[in-house]
Amino acid sequence: MLNRMAMVSGLENDPVMKREKEWSVQGLYTYTTPLFKEAGLSDYRLLRLLQEDRENNTDLYYTLKVYLLNENNVTMAADSLHIHRNTLVYRLKQIRECIEADINDNETARELLAFMMMYDISRQDEKRQK
């Protein structure tokens, strides 16, 4: 059993394994999103953030998504967004104030990212249906 665990842990950085994991997650969200949508489930924090983006022409939703996808690493997220680290820190402060949540709390971060993925997939589905 330890040999199998060592083999799997050794493949974490393998591009094929990463792609398989991404497809699995994408598939999970693709099939569960309609159920959440049908039940009327959404996250008020993200709705508030999207409203802030619409009203003030900000990009806080995308900023938060990139930050969470980079495992709350400010340096990596700033690089991904092609912005200065201090700019990201300022945006994260705005996000915290807007959604009134600790985005560095693991459970909160997972919830937000899960709802973001479902929201993004539902938007893609809506675009395809048009």
Can you describe what each PLM-predicted range is?
Residues 1-130:
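Cytosolic nucleotide-utilizing catalytic cores of signal-transduction proteins
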